[in-house]
Every structure is written in structure tokens, then in C-alpha cells.
């Protein structure tokens, strides 16, 4: 499972049965950044539904490779997810995934408003694909 943690959304992607291809699944929304209870609950449901053994969480590094506040929050999210679900967690560099996701969605010919809700799930699929390609 790939997860793109954001301040008000978490994009979710899963692999096919063979673990070869990542597919964007959904974007989980919340009103405030620290209101994560329902987000963790939904991810746990998806973990059970898809038989997930490993979650790849995007790590938003700065362009120089350093970690800022967003990376710290992503790590905290990942640690709490592991505690709540028992699933193994791997952090994956997610630099430039937003630009790549926007480019992919633009190639579909859809208007920006139509793709806004999908971008986080597409970013999660890119994060998961990058992990699969490196491992």
C-alpha cells in the first residue's frame, strides 16, 4: 500500500495481486490536520480488505534532501499507523511526485477541478511505484 500524507488528505494506492503495478485507490479527507482517528480507521479497513503487509509512506524531503516540518509530520503519521495496525512501514522519498502526478492527470485531458480530488491518490501510486522499482 502506498500512502501520501498531507495536511488534510491521505492519498491511498495499492498494488495488483502480483505486486507489480500500483493503482491509485482513493483520497481520504479530513477537516483538520490533527484529526486523524477516522483516517487511521479507514486505512485499517483498507489494509484488511487488500491484505496489506507493508505500507509505503511518502517522505516529503526538501530538495536538498533535508527533512523539514512536513517530513517530521509524515514520520509521526507513519509511526502511529504502525502502532495502530501492526503493518510494517517504509518511508519513501516523494520529492517531485506532485509535479509528476499533475503531469499524468493533465495527459488524461481532464480539467484541474476534476482531478483535484484524485491527485493525492495518484501521488500515492507514484510513491508506491518508486518503491517497487527500487526494491
Enumerate the predicted regions with their spans.
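Short glycine-aspartate micro-motif
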Residues: 2-4
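Phosphate- and other anionic-substrate recognition elements at nucleic-acid/protein interfaces
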Residues: 8-135
Amino acid at each position: 500500500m502506498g500512502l501520501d500524507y498531507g495536511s488534510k488528505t491521505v492519498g491511498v494506492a495499492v498494488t495488483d495481486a502480483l505486486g507489480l503495478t500500483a493503482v491509485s485507490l482513493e483520497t481520504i479527507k479530513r477537516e483538520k490536520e490533527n484529526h486523524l482517528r477516522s483516517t487511521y480507521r479507514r486505512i485499517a479497513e483498507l489494509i484488511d480488505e487488500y491484505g496489506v503487509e507493508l505500507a509505503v509512506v511518502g517522505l516529503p524531503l526538501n530538495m536538498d534532501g533535508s527533512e523539514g516540518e512536513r517530513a517530521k509530520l509524515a514520520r509521526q503519521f507513519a509511526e502511529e499507523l504502525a502502532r495502530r495496525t501492526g503493518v510494517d512501514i517504509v518511508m519513501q522519498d516523494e520529492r517531485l511526485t506532485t509535479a509528476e502526478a499533475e503531469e499524468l492527470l493533465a495527459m488524461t485531458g481532464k480539467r484541474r477541478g476534476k482531478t483535484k480530488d484524485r491527485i493525492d491518490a495518484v501521488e500515492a501510486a507514484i510513491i508506491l511505484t518508486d518503491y517497487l522499482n527500487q526494491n
